[in-house]
C-alpha cells in the first residue's frame, strides 16, 4: 500500500524502488522472493521503477552468489541500485592481506554489477559509511574496518578497488592520489 500511496500522491517524476538486504544469500530465495514481490505489486497496477540491494557483505562472501544475484536482478528490466555497500574484514586490526581482499571484493562487486546490469538500468552504487573511525560506526559493524578510509581518514586499498571497478581498468597509471 505504501508504494501505491507514494505513486498516487508523490511527485509524478519520482522513481520508486523496493529495497532489501541479503539478496546475495546462498539459496537466492530472498532475491527471487523480492523479484516476485515486485511482479505482484505491479500486478495490482502500481509501477515499480527499480530494485535496490543493500550489500553488507564480507571479504569471504560467496562470489558466485553475488554474480547470481546480479544476473537475476539484471533480468528484471528494472533500474538496479546497490544502496548500501560495505565489506567487512572481520577484524578491527586488518592485515595487509585482509585489506587486499577487501579491495578485491569491492572491485568484484562493481565488476559484476557492470557485467550483469544493463548500462541503461544501472542506477548507481552507494558506499555505506565513510571511514573506519569508531565514532562513525560504533552502532554499525563495531570492531571491524568495512569502509574505504581508515580510522585516520587515509585511503585504504579498498578505495583503489572501487576506482578500478568504476573505471573498468587499473587506474594506477592515471591516478596520482591527489584530490585537487
Which role does the model predict for each range below?
Residues 1-31, 81-84, 124-130:
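Aromatic-lined carbohydrate-recognition surfaces of secreted/lumenal glycan-active proteins
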Residues 26-41, 139-150:
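Short, electropositive alpha-helical surface patch
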Residues 8, 36, 160, 164:
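Charged/polar, solvent-exposed surface patches and flexible loops
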Residues 1, 31-37, 103-108:
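Well-ordered, non-membrane alpha-helical segments in soluble/globular domains
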Residues 26-27, 55-59, 95-99:
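Short, surface-exposed loop/turn motifs that are enriched in glycine and acidic residues
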Residues 64-179:
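Aromatic-rich peripheral "rim/lid" segments of glycoside hydrolase catalytic domains that contact
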Residues 26-28, 61-63, 135:
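Short acidic, gly/pro-rich beta-turn/loop elements at beta-sheet edges
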Residues 9, 14-20, 34-61, 66-91:
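Aromatic- and acid-rich polysaccharide-binding/catalytic face
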Amino acid at each position: 500500500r505504501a508504494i501505491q500511496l507514494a505513486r498516487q500522491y508523490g511527485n509524478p517524476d519520482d522513481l520508486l524502488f523496493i529495497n532489501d538486504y541479503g539478496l546475495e544469500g546462498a539459496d537466492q530465495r530472498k532475491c527471487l522472493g523480492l523479484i516476485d514481490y515486485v511482479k505482484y505489486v505491479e500486478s495490482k497496477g502500481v509501477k515499480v521503477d527499480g530494485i535496490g540491494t543493500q550489500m553488507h557483505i564480507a571479504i569471504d562472501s560467496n562470489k558466485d552468489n553475488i554474480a547470481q544475484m546480479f544476473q537475476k536482478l539484471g533480468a528484471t528490466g528494472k533500474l538496479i541500485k546497490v544502496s548500501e555497500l560495505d565489506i567487512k574484514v572481520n577484524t578491527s586490526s586488518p592485515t595487509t592481506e585482509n585489506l587486499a581482499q577487501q579491495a578485491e571484493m569491492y572491485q568484484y562487486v562493481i565488476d559484476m554489477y557492470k557485467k550483469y546490469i544493463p548500462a541503461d538500468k544501472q542506477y548507481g552504487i552507494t558506499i555505506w559509511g565513510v571511514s573506519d573511525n569508531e565514532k562513525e560506526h560504533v552502532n554499525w559493524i563495531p570492531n571491524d574496518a568495512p569502509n574505504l578510509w581508515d580510522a585516520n581518514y587515509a585511503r585504504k586499498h579498498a578505495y583503489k578497488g572501487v576506482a578500478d571497478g568504476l573505471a573498468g581498468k587499473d587506474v594506477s597509471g592515471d591516478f596520482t592520489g591527489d584530490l585537487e
